Amino acid sequence: MLCWGNASFGQLGLGGIDEEIVLEPRKSDFFINKRVRDVGCGLRHTVFVLDDGTVYTCGCNDLGQLGHEKSRKKPEQVVALDAQNIVAVSCGEAHTLALNDKGQVYAWGLDSDGQLGLVGSEECIRVPRNIKSLSDIQIVQVACGYYHSLALSKASEVFCWGQNKYGQLGLGTDCKKQTSPQLLKSLLGIPFMQVAAGGAHSFVLTLSGAIFGWGRNKFGQLGLNDENDRYVPNLLKSLRSQKIVYICCGEDHTAALTKEGGVFTFGAGGYGQLGHNSTSHEINPRKVFELMGSIVTEIACGRQHTSAFVPSSGRIYSFGLGGNGQLGTGSTSNRKSPFTVKGNWYPYNGQCLPDIDSEEYFCVKRIFSGGDQSFSHYSSPQNCGPPDDFRCPNPTKQIWTVNEALIQKWLSYPSGRFPVEIANEIDGTFSSSGCLNGSFLAVSNDDHYRTGTRFSGVDMNAARLLFHKLIQPDHPQISQQVAASLEKNLIPKLTSSLPDVEALRFYLTLPECPLMSDSNNFTTIAIPFGTALVNLEKAPLKVLENWWSVLEPPLFLKIVELFKEVVVHLLKLYKIGIPPSERRIFNSFLHTALKVLEILHRVNEKMGQIIQYDKFYIHEVQELIDIRNDYINWVQQQAYGMDVNHGLTELADIPVTICTYPFVFDAQAKTTLLQTDAVLQMQMAIDQAHRQNVSSLFLPVIESVNPCLILVVRRENIVGDAMEVLRKTKNIDYKKPLKVIFVGEDAVDAGGVRKEFFLLIMRELLDPKYGMFRYYEDSRLIWFSDKTFEDSDLFHLIGVICGLAIYNCTIVDLHFPLALYKKLLKKKPSLDDLKELMPDVGRSMQQLLDYPEDDIEETFCLNFTITVENFGATEVKELVLNGADTAVNKQNRQEFVDAYVDYIFNKSVASLFDAFHAGFHKVCGGKVLLLFQPNELQAMVIGNTNYDWKELEKNTEYKGEYWAEHPTIKIFWEVFHELPLEKKKQFLLFLTGSDRIPILGMKSLKLVIQSTGGGEEYLPVSHTCFNLLDLPKYTEKETLRSKLIQAIDHNEGFSLI
């Protein structure tokens, strides 16, 4: 051991020497053949811990700070600690803390301000005593200020006690002192790496390099750009991105070490202790310029001086106050910039020089400073081992974190045979949000040091792998302990306000734990976890949303699937029956799960869909609840102003309606909602008509009205007749049930006539003879023609017809691209829509965007124009102002493609689409429609082609003499299944009025086949109103085939049989 500095009280441990000041490093004979584990320096005393855990002290003992009876100039063992294996010490001005290998803390010395934490009345304690209030807490670090003390626990909890004159306890109170350790609640949840204390200021350092400081700040020693004392922890923002790994404090100054080996200092600089070649104070962290270029691995602060070790040269540098020789430069001069401590320093792994006396060279192991003294633990070049590196924290001094080594240790014990300490270790880790927040860090490239509002610093793949490694069926005791800790200790303590972004990480990682997706834990872990998440204040929730937004899709989907499973689990319980006494808590649980999904859905939509929108669909909803009733309840809640944006406590009193969270509905459920909404509106229209008709009986002035919207049309003039009626129709009448009458036909419209009406009128309206739509050969799709001569009324009519079809639950045959449905739902068409409508043009646009070279102008020769046909002639249209003079290049090509798409789908047809849109929404507007995705709305309007012919057979019903095994029925299905696809589609058209199936699927298409009294010479007859087929009792398969094909080839017109 080398020692230098103030020796006036024997604090260097050199024995009875004549000098009161040692100006340069001097070997201490006492430590020959002794290995030093730690050194603590007070103002006038020093404490040494040897590798065997014994403690020695020397220096002034006026206040009992040595832990034995008298002052000593040579180190003397503290006998009271003989039975303890001490691993670390720290000294205040005149008090000492010692930490043993069990995490227990012993204190002695001056207790004027409660700095010993013993809650006693004695001014001085001369024999070490255990701090009993910390005896049940495993402490890993201690730090002493002059008159206050700090401790860090394995569970990442910080405790403070002693003087609080300047707020150095960080408790936010103006009490002058605390005589017992106080938990620093304001920092709960943060994963800490270190605690440090100066004269009257304090710091904590997180695992990802964030520094929080509080206490005295007269000289800017907190680095907060001012000189105001702080009574609560404050984040030192300027160093957040610097990868700080270690921090130490002097009386009124602070030094911080970076991962790259740089040093920042701030605070009092009157003696040059900041190393900036000046005596100015610094209120902001400033890098020590003269150490740049060297990699520093150790730093230490004395009262008013600073030391730094550079392993590449083996040298120690010091700066600051030198009046007591504490700089080791051979003089008492102050140094304002780093100066080499005198000595024959030898770097680790250096090349031995020939003919040297190895005893005269020193390989530094570790440096210590405090008060006005300094120490260096060294070895000879011959026995030189690697020096300590403060950039690599000692694992024994760190908080619990879930990692590979810890899991392997836990799994190494046979199931059911855990030692108590292992159970305590598991419990401590999973009871602490701070420990979980320090787990699974993204250590590759030191990524976790970038933790902020946009980046979590978490390796999610590591979290998943380690959780799955830990939670295994053959180690149930571990799973049970983890679950109990989460349920009873961690989640109940969560708060809505968090001190820092690092305290949020476990909200990201915990869903990866298999216990969360175990239905046995839904109500005890997953839902309480979701409650804490939903209750987060706006700022932390926003950060969590930011982190979610950059997750890989499978990881994001994992969280969504978890809470979907929770919802399904709860709805199954609801279907079985919830006792009245438990309904309130059930409401709260269900609202929680749905609220979490709502937040995730908001993030998904904001990011342009991390996962497909349909991944939020809960397909079981229709089976588990009555959607129609749910919708009615929701409408009533809206009418009575029940706000579902309350907190979860208030929501518990409001019955849950799934319609409040419509993103969970799949297309079939949405269709049911729309149909329910239409039925409600129809009923309201009918009721209003009945009321008016009743009134007309007593008040002749009031004209009676029809409860239905009646369309009387001729087949030969279907468009003209329909337009005539619809032009005169009031908006309110569109909400009535539609009945269609074909002139000269006897059928009563129970649905089938209406189906054919839509089929025929749309065929007419979309006929090229009107010139209203352009037909695209490549895609076989149509789009509005900007060259039409037709009045916009006709487009308005088509919109009304489409709206009426949806409103009246009828499929219509429209060959529009998906872009139409996007526009109806207020979504923008994209290049993909252009590819669908105009495949060749779309491919060309994609090639333009993908072209890798810079010579786009020469290769493509494009400008911001589009060439269109106009009755045989071509016409050039500018896509932007001065488009003809604007060449398309690499920088603006995306803008050109966007403008092209916008022209085709928007600008060129704006007035025509507006008329269509107005007509459509006149009938079918409303909140429910906007729940649909474009492709879902398309499927609802035109049906889909997801044919399942076996399902059709399975769902068919029989009347009269027929049943499933009747001979005629058996040959009917044989014939049907042998028909080609086109004939099967024709059969659907013949029987139902459409060759497409409803969005609800084949199972919703109920066919009925009944026997007739006629002979085999008769054809099958369809009643499209009822999806009913009259099938004669054919006995021969070929006869049935011939008659069926003949019937479906002639399927237009209605007559009574």
UniProtKB/Swiss-Prot annotation:
SUPFAM superfamilies linked: Hect, E3 ligase catalytic domain, RCC1/BLIP-II
Subcellular location: Cytoplasm, Cytosol
The protein's Enzyme Commission number: 2.3.2.26
Chief subcellular location: cytoplasm
Domain of life: Eukaryota
Tissue: Expressed in brain and testis and detected in heart and placenta.
Entries under InterPro entries matching the protein: HECT_dom (IPR000569), Hect_E3_ubiquitin_ligase (IPR035983), RCC1/BLIP-II (IPR009091), Reg_chr_condens (IPR000408), Ub-ligase/GTPase-reg (IPR051709)
Catalytic residues as annotated in Swiss-Prot or TrEMBL: C1025 (glycyl thioester intermediate)
RCC1 repeats (start-end): 1-51, 52-101, 102-154, 156-207, 208-259, 261-311, 313-368
Leading EC class: transferase
An example Gene Ontology CC term for this record: cytosol
Coiled-coil annotated residue ranges, if any: none
Gene Ontology terms describing biological process: cell differentiation; negative regulation of smoothened signaling pathway; protein ubiquitination; spermatogenesis; ubiquitin-dependent protein catabolic process
Catalytic activity: S-ubiquitinyl-[E2 ubiquitin-conjugating enzyme]-L-cysteine + [acceptor protein]-L-lysine = [E2 ubiquitin-conjugating enzyme]-L-cysteine + N(6)-ubiquitinyl-[acceptor protein]-L-lysine
Keyword Metal-binding: no
HECT domain mapped to chain residues: 730-1057
Family annotation (PANTHER family): REGULATOR OF CHROMOSOME CONDENSATION DOMAIN-CONTAINING PROTEIN, UBIQUITIN-PROTEIN LIGASE E3A-RELATED
Stated role: Probable E3 ubiquitin-protein ligase involved in either protein trafficking or in the distribution of cellular structures. Required for spermatozoon maturation and fertility, and for the removal of the cytoplasmic droplet of the spermatozoon. E3 ubiquitin-protein ligases accept ubiquitin from an E2 ubiquitin-conjugating enzyme in the form of a thioester and then directly transfer it to targeted substrates.
Protein name per the record: Probable E3 ubiquitin-protein ligase HERC4
